[in-house]
From Swiss-Prot:
Gene3D superfamilies per the UniProt record, alphabetical: alpha/beta hydrolase, PLAT/LH2 domain
Name assigned to this protein: Lipoprotein lipase
Region (Important for interaction with lipoprotein particles), start-end ranges: 417-421
Record key words, sorted: Calcium, Cell membrane, Chylomicron, Disulfide bond, Extracellular matrix, Glycoprotein, Heparin-binding, Hydrolase, Lipid degradation, Lipid metabolism, Membrane, Metal-binding, Nitration, Secreted, Signal, VLDL
Gene encoding the protein: LPL
Species for this entry: Papio anubis
Any single GO CC term annotated in Swiss-Prot or TrEMBL for this entry: plasma membrane
Annotated disulfide bonds: C54-C67, C243-C266, C291-C310, C302-C305, C445-C465
Family: Belongs to the AB hydrolase superfamily. Lipase family.
Subunit text: Homodimer. Interacts with GPIHBP1 with 1:1 stoichiometry. Interacts with APOC2; the interaction activates LPL activity in the presence of lipids. Interaction with heparan sulfate proteoglycans is required to protect LPL against loss of activity. Associates with lipoprotein particles in blood plasma. Interacts with LMF1 and SEL1L; interaction with SEL1L is required to prevent aggregation of newly synthesized LPL in the endoplasmic reticulum (ER), and for normal export of LPL from the ER to the extracellular space.
Chain segments carrying region Essential for determining substrate specificity: 243-266
Length: 475
């Protein structure tokens, strides 16, 4: 009897060891399946947003528990771009911190492909395919191993990282929820086919910020063509406020040459800071407007919110999936918070004598129930008698309900005999203003029956004579 019990005990121990060894072999096999993945996946914490202290290792389930991955929350995967130094840029911990501030229970993973990103640009651009494959295999493993829903996954890629995110999204077993492209790189990608770059098919929703598209297609730092469901071009997508040459000279004079590299990529990196702004200032999202071109936007012709023609920039964007990519525009401030308030102004210039002037400088001042914004400069390429002109202006402060405006026609910076002999002028009865953010239209009337606007003279004053509030479905 005793020998039988010992035999059963020995059999149990043998079976247990066999099961354990098989489990170990299976785990080892799974690790080998991912041994060629070079990218690293660091789960950063709200307490330490700057350091990669814990890595999620594909094929090693214990690493997910060790890093305290939250299986019931959203996951953000931040993918950096090309690097000269081989180190993370200063924006990475800022974005991580902003994501955790907005979504405290989320997982923020930083994808480290620094060794590949530090090569000559064409080489690093080619590596985006391998990085995308690495990210896709990691995501697929998380879904298969832990049944983690891909509807909780949001990829954020900057520059080359945006295309790596797109390639990853195209290779996952199921579509991830969202990809945000932060000024996707232009060189090597402007004319690339969709499978080799970020495209609308790579996620349930793809939104893109274009902030440095200056130059000919294929040569601009950021990609020019739309590559998402919604493509937003702040300030036309070329240069960003505060990133101009004059600003560069001023900063170099104040801080020395150490910040030159920051100024070179200032507009490119602005895409990241605009997104960070949307995370931190959720109560006041910047509004972008769909438009056929930046020239039409500059004329104020696109401040409509009908049929999804306007949208929020950044995290709280409305996920509109149109058949064609939607190009949207907005103005911003030069620093955070970036939000401004857009207005379309329409003026009819009347007169008894035919006059035409080119490149005329004006100033307009707006006065509202909350604040005022004075001496806003604008230039009209042409001003002719008995013609109506539309243009865009914006204020950096919310002035509330519009009550009054002043319009001044500025003198030329050079001496003009014709202006000295007889000051040019136009008659203006009404000025129409539409506020983009509130969608309200206001008509301003001259304090007299007609205001006579003369070049270089006192501004003409107009007060609200009629307004018409419009809801979001109106024009």
């Amino acid at each position: 009897m005793e020998s039988k019990a010992l035999l059963l005990l020995a059999l149990a121990v043998w079976l247990q060891s066999l099961t354990a060894s098989r489990g170990g072999v299976a785990a080892a096999d799974q690790r080998r399946d991912f041994i060629d993945i070079e990218s690293k996946f660091a789960l950063r914490t709200p307490e330490d947003t700057a350091e990669d202290t814990c890595h999620l290792i594909p094929g090693v389930a214990e690493s997910v528990a060790t890093c305290h991955f939250n299986h019931s929350s959203k996951t953000f995967m931040v993918i950096h771009g090309w690097t000269v130094t081989g180190m993370y840029e200063s924006w990475v911990p800022k974005l991580v911190a902003a994501l955790y501030k907005r979504e405290p229970d989320s997982n923020v993973i930083v994808v480290d492909w620094l060794s590949r990103a530090q090569q000559h640009y064409p080489v690093s651009a080619g590596y985006t395919k391998l990085v995308g494959q690495d990210v896709a295999r990691f995501i697929n493993w998380m879904e298969e191993e832990f049944n983690y829903p891909l509807d909780n996954v949001h990829l954020l890629g900057y520059s080359l990282g945006a295309h790596a995110a797109g390639i990853a999204g195209s290779l996952t077993n199921k579509k991830v929820n969202r990809i945000t492209g932060l000024d996707p790189a232009g060189p090597n990608f402007e004319y690339a086919e969709a499978p080799s770059r970020l495209s609308p098919d790579d996620a349930d929703f793809v939104d893109v910020l274009h902030t440095f598209t200056r130059g000919s297609p294929g040569r601009s730092i950021g990609i020019q063509k739309p590559v998402g469901h919604v493509d937003i071009y702040p300030n036309g997508g070329t240069f960003q406020p505060g990133c101009n040459i004059g600003e560069a000279i001023r900063v170099i004079a104040e801080r020395g040459l150490g910040d030159v590299d920051q100024l070179v990529k200032c507009s490119h990196e602005r895409s990241i800071h605009l997104f960070i702004d949307s995370l931190l200032n959720e109560e006041n999202p910047s509004k972008a407007y769909r438009c056929s071109s930046k020239e039409a936007f500059e004329k104020g012709l696109c401040l409509s919110c009908r049929k999804n023609r306007c949208n929020n920039l950044g995290y709280e964007i409305n996920k509109v999936r149109a058949k064609r990519s939607s190009k949207m525009y907005l103005k911003t401030r030069s620093q955070m918070p970036y939000k401004v308030f857009h207005y379309q102004v329409k003026i009819h210039f009347s007169g008894t004598e035919s006059e035409t002037h080119t490149n005329q400088a004006f100033e307009i001042s707006l006065y509202g129930t909350v604040a005022e914004s004075e001496n806003i400069p604008f230039t009209l390429p042409e001003v002719s008698t008995n013609k109506t002109y539309s243009f865009l202006i914006y204020t950096e402060v919310d002035i509330g309900e519009l009550l009054m405006l002043k319009l001044k026609w500025k003198s030329d910076s050079y001496f003009s005999w014709s202006d000295w002999w007889s000051s040019p002028g136009f008659a203006i009865q009404k000025i129409r203003v539409k506020a983009g953010e509130t969608q309200k239209k206001v008509i301003f009337c001259s304090r007299e029956k007609v205001s006579h606007l003369q070049k270089g003279k006192a501004p003409a004053v107009f007060v609200k004579c009629h307004d018409k509030s419009l809801n979001k479905k109106s024009g």
